[in-house]
Curated annotation (Swiss-Prot):
Function: May serve as a plug to restrain the highly pressurized packaged genome and thus would be the first virion protein to contact the host cell wall, degrading the peptidoglycan layer and thereby facilitating viral genome entry into the host bacteria. Acts probably as a multifunctional enzyme that degrades N-acetylglucosamine polymers (in vitro) and cleaves the peptide cross-links of the host cell wall. Essential for the tail assembly.
Protein name: Morphogenesis protein 1
Family: In the N-terminal section; belongs to the glycosyl hydrolase 24 family.
Region Linker, residue ranges: 160-165
GN (gene name): 13
GO cellular component terms, A-Z: virus tail, tip
InterPro entries: Dup_hybrid_motif, Phage_lysozyme2
Species whose genome carries this gene: Bacillus phage phi29
UniProt region (Lysozyme-like glycosidase), positions on chain: 1-159
Example GO molecular function: metal ion binding
Binding annotation for substrate: 45, 71, 106, 137-140
UniProt entry keywords in alphabetical sequence: Antimicrobial, Bacteriolytic enzyme, Cell wall biogenesis/degradation, Degradation of host cell envelope components during virus entry, Degradation of host peptidoglycans during virus entry, Glycosidase, Hydrolase, Late protein, Metal-binding, Metalloprotease, Multifunctional enzyme, Protease, Viral genome ejection through host cell envelope, Viral penetration into host cytoplasm, Viral release from host cell, Viral short tail ejection system, Viral tail assembly, Virion, Virus entry into host cell, Zinc
Active site: 45
Length: 365
């Protein structure tokens, strides 16, 4: 069941429709990020209601109608009639959007992304909401950041589509005290590796997200891990990550070991080629362990990422952050995919998000 009527939907009704749209478009090859970027716009345009007329002025085909408020409504209605489709219908409107993708209609490339590229994009839901706003909706007032907020909300709270239960990548240690930074001396030269020391020797660090051990190197005292799913990074990007922890000895885990976010992952140590008890940390983009690269000998092969762009430092004491741009995040971990566990905590946010929706105040042309 979906909700189709000429009224503004409640958050619970919007969620039913949003989940339906996610399922429908996922099966047609859209990424979850792209769908939620569009949902963030649909929420402002129509409260995700395929039966909504602009200003509730039913039958006024010179105004907007439907999920994305096609304006004038007659353009969409005439198309639906020509296809033999009922125009007040969720599937009909989604078929129209797919038709627009395939026929290069409605979309004007104002953000260096075609409509076909948009539906496959894995940029953040927030970024894609802004791209959809600029290239598809094109309102008189383009400054509507709440559409990005709404897109992130749907990405977190809808199940399926490849992104349910999205976790924030949390910095693994409860302190930051850097003993050697990026592009440092010896093994750090030309790399984004960072060494951290604890308050004591054998200081603990913890899994930043649900993850799996993918490589064990006893001679160098290192374990490589990959995230089990894409994670929300401190800089707002959504991606798989692979990282290496070095110097604990003996190594505590074997390849294939799975950890949940917050599980004990290791300790600072003096294993391998090391001077003093510390933790050598390095992260790359993606979920494939590609071995070491010689820079000269301590960096993961692949596309290195800045640790401070990936791992949020919520509740982390920064003793010596080396001047890097460490970031906190207000992202709350998803519910594991069923979309229900966070409902009580999000009631206030739901109301605020709904009140922000332009649909409650009319539309911007």
């Amino acid at each position: 069941m979906v909700y189709v009527s000429n009224k503004y939907l409640t958050m619970s009704e919007m969620k039913v429709n949003a989940q339906y749209i996610l399922n429908y478009l996922s099966s047609n090859g859209w990424t979850k990020q792209a769908i939620c970027g569009m949902l963030g716009n649909m929420q402002s345009e129509s409260t995700i209601n395929p039966g909504l007329w602009q200003n509730l002025d039913e039958g006024n085909t010179s105004l907007g109608f439907g999920l994305v408020q096609w304006t004038p409504a007659s353009n969409y209605i005439n198309w639906a009639n020509s296809q033999g489709l009922p125009y007040k219908d969720m599937d009909s409107e989604l078929k129209r959007i797919i038709w627009e993708v395939n026929n290069n209609a409605q979309w004007i490339n104002l953000r260096d992304m075609t409509f076909k590229e948009y539906i496959k994009s894995t940029k953040t839901p927030r970024e894609l909401a802004m791209i959809f706003l600029a290239s598809y909706e094109r309102p008189a007032n383009p400054n509507q950041p709440e559409r990005g907020d709404q897109a992130e909300y749907w990405y977190k709270n809808l199940s399926g589509g490849g992104g349910g239960g999205l976790q924030l990548a949390q910095f693994p240690m409860d302190i930051i005290n850097i003993s050697q930074g990026e592009n440092g001396s010896f093994s750090h030269k030309g790399t984004l590796c960072i060494d951290f020391v604890g308050k004591t020797e054998k200081y603990p660090y913890y899994a930043p997200c649900d993850c799996t051990c993918v490589w064990r190197g006893d001679a160098s005292a290192y374990l490589a891990w990959t995230s089990d799913k894409e994670v929300m990074c401190a800089d707002g990007s959504v991606r798989y990550i692979t990282w290496v922890n070095v110097h604990e000895s003996p190594l505590p885990f074997d390849v294939g070991k799975k950890l949940k976010k917050g599980d004990l992952m290791g300790h600072t140590g003096i294993g391998g080629n090391v001077t003093g008890d510390h933790w050598h940390f390095n992260v790359i983009d993606g979920k494939e362990y590609q071995g070491w690269t010689k820079k000269p000998d301590s960096c993961l092969a692949g596309t290195e990422l800045h640790i401070y762009d990936v791992f949020a430092v919520n509740n982390v004491e920064i003793i010596n952050g080396n001047g890097y741009d460490w970031k906190t995040s207000d992202w709350q971990d998803g519910d594991g995919g069923d979309g229900d566990d966070d409902n009580d905590n999000n009631k206030t946010k739901d109301l605020i998000t709904l009140l922000l929706s332009d649909a409650l105040h009319g539309w911007k042309a």
